């Protein structure tokens, strides 16, 4: 069992033996207090396995984006623990957390977040340039060919379609070879064809490179590209699905009233 919201936390594995790229242990996130208190996450424990594509789904307000943001170190828990590999994020200073996000985590958001004055190639290498890290040219070439951007590297974002811009964002996340990539509604601003292209590239990153991806989505078709889906409702994990398909996901979501 890899996900639970029961009151008995799983024992942490010995350092170095954890097969989780990331995990939450008894994670709770509370906003407000008293009559205005909202429990966005309520004692959730979940593992995200290495080299796997996991989707997080649930109705609006279920806590899925909150869970992703807390596990990615973009927000803090009210109680519980979050680990990236064997590293407990609660034990890190702000500077250490910033460095961990830079060096070990890739992000893909609904908004492309590209720098408009930079070319596609410059946007892809920007995180490494800011970190003072040398670009691995062989890996860069592999990523570019995987996301099919070779003939668009000199183009600026305004010269690219939405799908091409999101492929640049995916390439940027892959280029630094992070331990895990978090994607928050990555196809939310794309048409169906562009969405399919981006999701296919993400799937290839898992299958061919062993990349770990955790994706928040409302879309059953997008979730169907994952190896596993974790379903949230009211801050709890309420179900899981292995080897999903779009039709199976849609049927399951209907049961949740969405």
Where are these regions (language model features)?
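Pre-NBD coupling/linker segments of ABC/ABC-like ATPases
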Residues: 2-17
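Conserved beta-strand-loop-alpha-helix hinge in the C-terminal portion
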Residues: 236-258
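ABC family nucleotide-binding domain
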Residues: 19-226, 232-234
């Amino acid at each position: 069992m890899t996900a639970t919201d029961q009151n008995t936390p799983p024992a942490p594995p010995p350092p170095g033996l954890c097969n989780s790229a990331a995990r939450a242990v008894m994670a709770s996130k509370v906003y407000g207090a008293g009559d205005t208190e909202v429990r966005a996450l309520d004692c959730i424990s979940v593992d995200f396995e290495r080299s796997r594509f996991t989707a997080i789904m649930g109705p609006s307000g279920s806590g899925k984006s909150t869970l992703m943001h807390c596990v990615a170190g973009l927000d803090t828990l009210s109680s519980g623990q979050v680990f990236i590999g064997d590293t407990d994020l609660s034990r890190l200073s702000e500077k250490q957390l910033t460095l961990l996000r830079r060096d070990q985590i890739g992000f893909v958001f609904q908004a492309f977040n590209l720098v408009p004055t930079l070319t596609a190639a410059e946007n892809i290498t920007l995180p490494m340039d800011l970190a003072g890290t040398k670009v691995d040219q062989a890996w860069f070439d592999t990523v570019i060919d995987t996301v099919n951007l070779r003939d668009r590297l000199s183009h600026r974002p305004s010269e690219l379609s939405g799908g091409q811009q999101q492929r640049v964002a995916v390439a940027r996340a892959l280029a630094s070879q992070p331990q895990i990539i978090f994607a928050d509604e990555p196809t939310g601003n794309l048409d169906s064809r562009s969405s399919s292209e981006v999701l296919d590239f993400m799937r290839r990153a898992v299958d061919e490179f062993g990349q770990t991806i955790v994706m928040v989505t409302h879309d059953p078709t997008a979730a169907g590209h994952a190896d596993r889906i974790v379903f949230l409702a009211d801050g709890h994990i309420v179900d899981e699905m292995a080897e999903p398909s779009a039709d199976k996901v849609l049927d399951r979501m209907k049961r949740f009233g969405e």
